[in-house]
Design a protein with these regions (language model features):
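Short, conserved micro-motifs composed of acidic
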Residues: 87-88, 101-108, 127, 136-145, ...
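Blade/loop signatures of beta-propeller domains
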Residues: 2-27, 192-194
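Long amphipathic alpha-helical scaffold regions
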Residues: 73-99, 117-120, 171-184
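Multi-bladed beta-propeller domains
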Residues: 21-38, 67-85, 128-148, 186-198
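A short loop-to-beta-strand structural motif that recurs across blades of beta-propeller domains
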Residues: 15-17, 63-65, 125-127, 181-183
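Short, conserved, GDST-rich strand-edge loop motifs in beta-rich repeat architectures
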Residues: 1-11, 100-122, 163-179
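Surface-exposed loop/turn positions within WD40 beta-propeller blades
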Residues: 13, 50, 58-61, 123, ...
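Blade-terminus and WD-like Trp-Asp/Gly-His loop motifs, strongest in beta-propeller folds
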Residues: 35-38, 44-60, 83, 88-101, ...
Length: 198
């Protein structure tokens, strides 16, 4: 779990922790004091296995950390294939793949009562990362200019990738017009290939 003080405008000390349920012993996976001035996102484990997890470190020198067994790998936050950070992960049931959305997010704060904060995407695409081969699996069906693809999830059998998509709006002006479609695309776990249509 991620422990952070209440509020969302600023943060000071935060970290990702594991806790034993039998005796409540706690250990830090990482604290942001180890990466000064940066934010650590919630981590996602593969089928609740504490030895296999991923999380993203936000900031100028951020990256995405994969831990599989005894091996740790840090991926650059951006490269020529993806334009934003690797934000929302979801593991394939096999543990061989992890899907992400790559988002350029912004926050908008309201000036009226009972309206707190809106988080919106300036852009968002989806891809799958092959954990064993250390390769990005990208497709133009999941990376479009006019739409934001987001929140990818594998089906229980690992043969379908579900996600949401929406037409880009003029943010923050038209944030209330944001509507999402639920989509899916076939995924072959044996080859790491997507289907031909979404």
């Amino acid at each position: 779990y991620r422990r952070i003080a209440p509020g969302y405008e600023v943060y000071s000390k935060m970290g990702l922790y594991e806790r034993r349920l039998d005796n409540f012993d706690e250990r830090a996976l990482i604290e942001n004091t180890q990466v000064p001035g940066m934010c650590v996102n919630c981590h996602t484990s593969c089928k609740t296995n504490p030895d296999n997890y991923v999380f993203h470190i936000r900031g100028d020198h951020g990256g995405t950390l994969f831990k599989t067994g005894q091996k740790t790998e840090i991926l650059k936050a951006k490269n020529d294939s993806i334009k934003g950070s690797m934000v929302y992960p979801y593991w394939h049931p096999s543990g061989k793949y992890c899907t992400f959305s790559t988002n350029m997010t912004r926050q908008g704060f309201h000036m009226v009562k009972d309206e707190r904060v809106e988080v919106f995407d300036l852009s968002s695409d989806i891809f799958v990362y092959d954990v064993e081969k250390h390769e990005l699996i990208v497709d133009t069906l999941l990376s479009t200019k006019l739409y934001s693809e987001n929140s990818p999830v594998f089906s229980a059998d690992g043969r379908t990738l579900y996600y949401i998509t929406s037409l880009q709006q003029d943010y923050p002006l038209y944030y209330k017009d944001q509507k999402y479609n639920l989509c899916r695309i076939a995924f072959d776990p044996a080859t790491g290939r997507y289907g031909e249509k979404a």
